[in-house]
Amino acid sequence: MYVAVKGGEKAIANAHALQENRRRGDDTLAELSVAQIEQQLNLAVDRVMTEGGIADRELAALALKQASGDNIEAIFLLRAYRTTLAKLAVSEPLNTAEMRLERRISAVYKDIPGGQLLGPTYDYTHRLLDFTLLANGETPPLRTADAMQDAAPHVFSLLANQGLAKREEDSGAMPDDITRTPPVCPCSRSSRLQQLMRGDEGYLLALAYSTQRGYGRNHPFAGEIRSGYVGLETVPEELGFAVNVGELLMTECEMVNGFVAPENDAPHFTRGYGLVFGMSERKAMAMALVERALQAPEYDETVTGPAQDEEFVLAHADNVEAAGFVSHLKLPHYVDFQAELELLKRLQQEAARDD
């Protein structure tokens, strides 16, 4: 039972003013601009865009500033804003094989068509605090060269050409849209991928880690991780042909997972897939691992771990929903607690009489 309580309007206004003052911090210091957040906290912006469901770096940076750097609050702000937007068009499927690469690595083949590209990464740093950033924050000038990129087909397409993996085929079915129709388990793969993309990174990371510790049959290799710019196209009704309307910075991960040996088919590797906005590589990898774990029923695998339980995974992945439900405990529950209190006192009195 929930009790509607009207709080003091003045107290609430004062609380908001205090929060705004705390957000701003010491006013003798220069205020952090949205442009600075967008450029210098770019990985935080990437996460807010991915889980907020809007590919707009400026809006994601604004949300982070308004939320004092609280990722989940920023994601909530972006989701709320998204509900006010009209759906203008539907884009064509993204062709990630033609991605203008910023980074591309494979853990299964050293030499791949198009080559590997290390790109920007923290992977090989020593994780030591860089105190020079306290002094001036200057970075040395970066030497660049003209971009020259060879064709870079997906590693999984190479496996498929050798008969070692199934080729992904487009069924032609219209993908689900979880923003318009609430998902219901069992979910289609399109619905599942959308929910995982919007799911909380920490939650998916923990589930992905659990699959590596024996809670679910999953033996993965990072087949390919690629980050870069993908062209975005749409087909206007009045034109009837695709028009490029921009590009998106995205990260894609395909995990090569343990093989299966169906009765009516040749043994082959399976795959898990992850796709996110920006350079959120860790999220893409976690998403791919969990996505494969959720395919257990399709391969007649025994569901033994939490990451393989579709209803459990997807029902608890949304951090906005989770934060909202946990936060509601801060609301007054006076009547509920009073009922529990009266019951406890009555039980204590009955126990005392029995003694």
Ranges and model annotations:
Residues 143-355:
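Acidic, serine/proline-rich low-complexity intrinsically disordered regions
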